[in-house]
C-alpha cells in the first residue's frame, strides 16, 4: 500500500513532463494522410469492420497483437479513409502467423505479439511503406506517437472514418506494475500515455504501433476502461525485447524461441 502511494505521488510529479491537452485516438487529431504508410487495418472476410491495426515492417511482414487474431483475417494496406479508397490500397491475407506460446501468464497479456507473413509481398507506394524495428529500447519520458481507427470517445461508441493520431510519453515500468496487477515485473511490456488523461489508445486501436523516433517501440495491448483516465497509461508490448525473435523468423528460422 505504501509503495502504491509513493508511486502515485511520483506520477503526479511526472505530470510536468506531459503536455496538457483537452483532446480526447481517444484524444487525438486526424492523422495526416501521408504520415502512416506503415499502418495497416485488420478485419475479417465476414465483416468490413476494422477490429485492430498492425504495422508493416517489410514488404512481406506485418506486426500486430496476438489478441487481434481472427479466422479469415484480412489486412488492408495504404488505407486512410474507410469510405474513400486510396488508389494504391492493397489487400492481403496471411500465409502464416507466428506467435509466442505462453503458459506462465494464461491471459496472454505478457506476450501479446503476432508476426504475420503475407501471402504476397506488397509494393511500396505513396501510402504504403514499412517502418523500422527499434535499434535500441525507448527510455522514460520519450515522446511517441500513437494512431489508429479506434474509438475517439470515452462515453460513446464513436469510431472515426480516418485514423487519429496523438503524442504521448513513455512512463516508468514500475508504475505499470503498481497500476496493473496483471503486469509482472519481468513482463516484456512498457507503458505510455498522458498522465493527466485525455489522450490514449482505445478499443479498435489494438495491435497498432507506438512510434518513437521513427521506429516501432510498442504494440497496443491493453489499458484502462474507460480509456484515457488520469494516471492510467496504456500497456504496450515492448517490441525491442522481441527483435531477435522477429528477425530470426523473417530470416527463415521458423522455430526460433520466443523470449
From Swiss-Prot:
It holds the Pfam family Trypsin. It comes from the Eukaryota. Glycans are attached at residue 253. Its EC number is 3.4.21.95. N-glycosylated. Contains 4.4% of hexoses, 4.4% of hexosamines and 3.1% of sialic acids. Keywords: Blood coagulation cascade activating toxin, Disulfide bond, Glycoprotein, Hemostasis impairing toxin, Hydrolase, Protease, Secreted, Serine protease, Sialic acid, Signal, Toxin. Residues 25-251 form the Peptidase S1 domain. InterPro entries: Peptidase_S1_PA (IPR009003), Peptidase_S1_PA_chymotrypsin (IPR043504), Peptidase_S1A (IPR001314), Trypsin_dom (IPR001254), TRYPSIN_SER (IPR033116). Expressed by the venom gland. Monomer. This is Factor V activator. It comes from Macrovipera lebetinus (Levantine viper).
